Amino acid sequence: MNITVQQLDDIRKSGETHTLLDIREAEELAAASISGALHIPMNTIPENLDKLPTDQPIVVMCHVGGRSAQVQMWLHGNGFENAVNLEGGIHAWSLSIDSSVPQY
């Protein structure tokens, strides 16, 4: 399941409880980030499942949405039915929601 950056912006503005999971690598995080995101690189997700909430939506984010779609499907298959993919990733967020987030 996917959500748009507009939907995520609405969730954040409403104060609805959620976790924004940034699965990008550290170098990408240094280039651009969204405040409040939980950073767990994609290749370390399996060993960090205990850091993920089971009682709220998890919005999985990467650069443009490809890796996060894979992680969302994997999480869903491993019991995190509340995981959704952020379409377009941080790139779409920068273009449509917050131009202060650098593009790379």
Language-model region placement:
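Short, surface-exposed ligand- or partner-binding patches at beta-edge/loop junctions that are enriched
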Residues: 61-62
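Rhodanese-like catalytic fold shared by cysteine-dependent sulfurtransferases
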Residues: 1-19, 26-57, 66-104
